[in-house]
Amino acid sequence: MEYSQTAILPRLPVIVGPTASGKSSLGIQLAQRFAGEIISADSRQVYRGMDIGTAKVTPEERAMIPHHLLDVVDPGETYTVSQYQQAAITVINDILMRGKQPFLVGGSPHYIQTIVDNFDIPAVAPQPELRAQLEEQPLEALLAQLEQLDPQSYATIDRRNPRRIIRALEVCLVTGKPFSDQRGQARPLYHCLLLAIDWPREILYQRIDARVDERMAEGMVQEVESLLQQGVSHERLEALGLEYRFISRWLRGEISSKEEMVQRLKYAIHDFTRRQLTWFRRDKRILWLAGGTAMEQQAQEMVKVFLSGK
């Protein structure tokens, strides 16, 4: 929805898109060019100790450009979309007050949407007893219940992520209303420019596969073992993303070899990326930049014009 006030709202460039498309690198380049700071919009990078598996920016990159909303909570804790929304708005406004330019960068659709569209997220506190009951149910039963209570959320939710499914059910059961009906859109807080990097599908898959190989070489397995030693359960790892899920299953003996685990992980990320692309393609506000050598200069020119108010 468009509002006449858009012209006077603070301007917020937003870099979105699928995994391994180059969002973080482009965000850093733009922040350097326009005296900016970066707010992460990644639902897994909020967790401490999950660095390799989430492709978190390095300490050297953080030293170059301030990054916000990384390492917010421990992996065993819950961090809701509502908590993210409140924290991100606070950080963005602080950056603006200091005369710097905020850039929102990430690939988690719900995090991005709650800032770009300023959704009113239902403020339902975690219900430990209800969650414990739901966690005892098989995934198929949870999905069937969500389909009955909230068909719209059922159609769009990550069906391999029990944590998100349980949260949606939690809101439905506590409020008596579908989760999707409670995400009202308020007036926007920022005038946003949404950019994404577009790669041919086969090249994007090659980038994904190369990233998986790099993560394994950098110590991804050791990172998962460290999380287990810190008390993060295998069940929790299942909900923390594909990399942690597949390595956990291999360590438990559910996958016979490391080579098989890596190959299955790559295929799973390909599938996840297809769903990411479907979600982002639906948003016609996103401007897609062809990946390649000319992309960075094109992005800089677009952001320059956008920030100038033209």
Q: What residue ranges belong to the model's regions?
A:
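Phosphate/pyrophosphate-binding catalytic cores of soluble transferases and nucleic-acid-acting enzymes
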Residues: 1-310
